Amino acid sequence: MNKRVKDVVDAIVAAVQRVLDQKEVTEAEYRTAVHYLMQVAEQRETALLCDVFFNSTVAATKARISEGSTPAIEGPYYRDDAPLVDDRLKTYDTDDHKPLLIQGTVKAVDGSVVEDVTIDVWHSTPDGKYSGFHDDIPTDFYRGKLRVGTDGSFRVRTTMPVPYQIPDQGPTGALLETMGGHSWRPAHVHFKVKAPGYETLTTQYYFEGGDWITDDCCNGVQSSLITPDIVEEGVRLMNINFVIEPARAQAGANP
């Protein structure tokens, strides 16, 4: 028996049972919910539904016990096969969005330089889509892997991402609408920072003053993840100093 699985599932079941009782959910409402979950599965939106309502809580829990930079939701558009890049992500020739320079450092909790660090960077196209997932956009556009310098520094040029709507034509979008919500995410850039012997940091950073920054449909925005509105010579700057922590044992790793 996996005690960790039992403890978590028992707690989830107890919480749902408590809400069913407190809200006096009827048999008809219960059956509607069961049918809804079947629709979610049939339309392959299980991951989307869970990400919208629960992923930010998992990220916030990790942030609470972490000594490193603030983690955030990964989202569904990460690809491990992104190409290595030197100083620029590949973008459309027709992309006339404001240039963006992402730069900063990666350090350990004690401030020391970490060896052999790579950073995955990915963000939306100017029309709110992701390479390798939408419209046959080549997988090497708007994403790449950076090798961090021996001094812990990195920099890469790209263009500004845009706010976009998560898929909202299926049951997840219908539920958000029924609840009076919406399906918009603020513009952001994703990062995954990896180094041998260290916890992988998965996070995303946002832009001060951006649309939907205070009303993200996925509740993913934390104040520590919002970068200030700094523009130099027509280039928006995103300055980030990542802090990563030593790897630790994972709860429930052994059955």
Curated annotation (Swiss-Prot):
Keywords: Aromatic hydrocarbons catabolism, Dioxygenase, Iron, Metal-binding, Oxidoreductase, Plasmid
Source species: Cupriavidus pinatubonensis (strain JMP 134 / LMG 1197)
PANTHER family, per database record: DIOXYGENASE, PUTATIVE (AFU_ORTHOLOGUE AFUA_2G02910)-RELATED (PTHR33711), INTRADIOL RING-CLEAVAGE DIOXYGENASES DOMAIN-CONTAINING PROTEIN-RELATED (PTHR33711:SF7)
Gene: tfdC
Function: Preferentially converts 3,5-dichlorocatechol as opposed to other chlorinated catechols. Retains diminished activity toward non-chlorinated substrates.
Signal peptide: none
Gene Ontology process terms (BP): catabolic process; catechol-containing compound metabolic process
Binding site for Fe cation: Y130, Y164, H188, H190
Keyword Iron: yes
GO molecular function: catechol 1,2-dioxygenase activity; ferric iron binding
UniProt cofactor(s): Fe(3+)
SUPFAM superfamilies, per the entry: Aromatic compound dioxygenase (SSF49482)
A Pfam family reported for this protein in Swiss-Prot or TrEMBL: Dioxygenase_N
Record keyword Metal-binding present: yes
UniProt name for this protein: Chlorocatechol 1,2-dioxygenase
Reaction(s) catalysed (UniProt annotation): 3,5-dichlorocatechol + O2 = (2E,4E)-2,4-dichloromuconate + 2 H(+)
EC code(s) of this entry: 1.13.11.-
